[in-house]
Amino acid sequence: FNTPAPDLTHSYSYNGRGELAADAMSRGGTYSYVYDNIGNRVTSREGSGASAAAYTANSLNQYTAITREEEAPFAPGYDADGNQTKIQTSTGEWEVSYNALNQAARFIQGNRRVECRYDYLNRRIEKAVYEGEVLMSKKRFIYHGYLQIAELDAADATESAMPVLRKTYLWDPLEPVATRILAMSLFDETGTYVEDLYYTHDLLKNATALFGIRAGRRALYEYGPYGNILRMEGNAAEDNPFRFSSEYADDELGLVYYNYRYYNPQNGRW
């Protein structure tokens, strides 16, 4: 921002099937990928000094082994419906269990667990994070259609105490499908309005920065080609969950929630 030349540039190259083969960045090195004939990754190397990763896929195009240099091989797990029950993300390994509708209901990592509830339209309406039996946070989500328009703190909610409004969101009305987020309003722990923040985006709909009316730039984001965070800074950076592709980032899980399914930037898969 306010520089005569871009601070970061991406130069993309593709193979004969139109798959991303390399992203040469002006800062951070090159991300490179090799695929099999069906489009599964065979190898990847993401950035300068990064270790290479090798992938093994079965006849159902499910990864059955992911091996990174100097790390023990990781073996993803699946249930009979094809849901992935063992995942590896930027925050570590998680065991995932699903409800009868094949919705991810519980994520477990050691003493930590994340529990999710959904409504009849398959929208996630609640996310609770526990350390052992201690509730660390509980968020409830309000939607207009499939666009999240509000987030409430329900950690202390009871029959007599309502959840507290913490965030509201404004979306681009000119793009009803695959839209982008335009603004976020923040509220304090009592539900009192604090401020509005406004988004800038790149051409891929990724949120690149947040600006306040008085305080200037409040957050900055940079991404790898498959959505991993390369740079995130600013005193409002973590307040904003809508980053890559203007979708909701679950920081605890290292996943991105796309309403119908979760995306894992670490291996570029849903």
Q: Where do the language-model regions lie?
A:
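A residue-level detector for well-ordered beta-strand positions
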Residues: Y12, Y33, A53-Y55, A75-P76, ...
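Carboxylate/His-rich catalytic cores and anion/metal-binding grooves
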Residues: I142-Y143, I149-A150, E159-R166, R214-N228
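Exposed loop/turn and edge beta-strand positions of beta-sandwich/beta-sheet ligand-binding modules
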Residues: L8, G29, S51, A72, ...
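A motif-centric feature for acidic-aromatic and gly/ser/thr-rich catalytic loops and repeats
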Residues: G49-N58, T64-A65, E69, P173, ...
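A surface-exposed, glycine/aromatic-enriched loop/edge motif typical of exported proteins
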Residues: V34-T43, H144, L204
